[in-house]
């Protein structure tokens, strides 16, 4: 009971930190706001500075929160579905497939912009299915599966490079220049994906069972692995439709959360949601304040942090095999 209460207290502390970070991000930037500016806005309704920030900065913050949460949860789900601690949507080519589909849709059917998360999901599904089919035939270990994923990532990025030579191919890059319609589109996918994940989370712990153990308790492990994988691909692909590829968030957060609260997915999923949202928000905030008025993309900061962590996890995986 004491451990459970400690986890609840930790979760509440993380929520407070997340809210505080969101506030700092809201008032920090080229146009700075004071607390009095906000009070004036909410009491009189007249403050042009706050109005401009609400239209320019608030959508960016909300999208950072949703994307961070979705990518972190997607990483945790992929690791559960593939039974691979190194799995992440960007590394295994899911994000690249989704981005190619996004580019094609914007060129040929731009009127379906509202459905981009769903259409990107179709693109992200292709590399995921290739990984699954190859794994079922060759039974890759964790590192070999990631190497196949990296090969797919390189291949698909080559295709993407060719496609983007066409100036009509609009590819989203990072969190800048986001508007309220982007928030609404992503919010639908975020709510749907995260709610389904919470409903599925009690079953995720059973994915660690082998086939014989699963059958003995009447658990259809293959069905739930597929459901978990599809949900992970959907969450990652939906973010790609709005902000493009963001690396390593799906690896960093689940492993940090496991160190904090253990591997129980009922606890891991909510914590990953909050920490993922916070981490991307911090990366975006740092990118805005390190070298103003220039902005460093949040993806660059994530890559600097995530690259060494991936190397560490690969070394740890190899050490466990010895």
From Swiss-Prot:
Q: What induces the gene encoding this protein?
A: Repressed by fur in the presence of iron.
Q: Which Pfam families match?
A: FecCD
Q: Which family does it belong to?
A: Belongs to the binding-protein-dependent transport system permease family. FecCD subfamily.
Which segments cross the bilayer?
9-29, 61-81, 89-109, 114-134, 143-163, 179-199, 233-253, 267-287, 294-314
Q: What is this protein called?
A: Probable heme-iron transport system permease protein IsdF
Please name the PANTHER family in this protein's record.
Answer: FERRIC ENTEROBACTIN TRANSPORT SYSTEM PERMEASE PROTEIN (PTHR30472), HEME-IRON TRANSPORT SYSTEM PERMEASE PROTEIN ISDF-RELATED (PTHR30472:SF21)
- GO MF, one example: transmembrane transporter activity
Q: Which UniProt keywords apply?
A: Cell membrane, Iron, Membrane, Transmembrane, Transmembrane helix, Transport
The UniProt entry's GO CC annotations, sorted and at most eight, read: plasma membrane
Q: Is this entry keyworded Transmembrane helix? A: yes
Q: Which domain of life is it from?
A: Bacteria
Q: Does the record bear Lipid metabolism in its keywords?
A: no
An example Gene Ontology biological process: siderophore-dependent iron import into cell
Its lineage opens with: Bacteria, Bacillati, Bacillota, Bacilli, Bacillales
């Amino acid at each position: 009971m004491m451990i459970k209460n400690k986890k609840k207290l930790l979760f509440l502390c993380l929520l407070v930190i997340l809210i505080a970070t969101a506030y700092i991000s809201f008032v920090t930037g080229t146009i700075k706001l004071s607390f009095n500016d906000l009070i004036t806005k909410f009491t009189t309704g007249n403050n042009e500075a706050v109005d401009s920030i609400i239209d320019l900065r608030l959508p960016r913050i909300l999208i950072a929160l949703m994307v961070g949460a979705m990518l972190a949860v997607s990483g945790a789900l992929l690791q559960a579905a593939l039974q691979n601690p190194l799995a992440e949507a960007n590394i295994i080519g899911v994000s690249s497939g989704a981005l190619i589909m996004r580019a094609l849709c914007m060129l040929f059917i731009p009127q379906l912009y509202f459905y981009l998360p769903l259409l990107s999901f179709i693109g992200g599904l292709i590399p995921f299915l290739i990984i699954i089919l190859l794994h079922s035939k060759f039974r890759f270990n964790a590192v070999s599966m990631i190497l196949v994923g990296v090969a797919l990532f390189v291949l698909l990025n080559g295709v993407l490079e060719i496609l983007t030579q066409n100036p009509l191919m609009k590819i989203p890059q990072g969190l800048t220049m986001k508007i309220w319609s982007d928030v609404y589109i992503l919010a639908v996918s975020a709510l749907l994906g995260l709610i389904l994940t919470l409903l599925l989370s009690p079953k995720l712990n059973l994915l660690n069972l082998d086939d014989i153990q699963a059958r003995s308790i009447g658990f259809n492990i293959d069905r739930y692995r597929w459901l978990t994988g599809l949900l992970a691909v959907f969450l990652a692909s939906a973010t790609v439709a709005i902000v493009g590829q963001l690396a390593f968030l799906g690896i960093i957060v689940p492993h940090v959360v496991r160190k904090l609260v253990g591997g129980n997915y009922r606890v891991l999923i909510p914590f990953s949601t909050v920490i993922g949202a916070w981490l991307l928000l911090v990366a975006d905030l740092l990118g805005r304040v390190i070298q103003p008025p220039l902005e460093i993309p949040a993806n660059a900061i994530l890559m600097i942090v995530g690259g060494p962590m991936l190397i560490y996890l690969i070394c740890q995986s190899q050490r466990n095999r010895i």
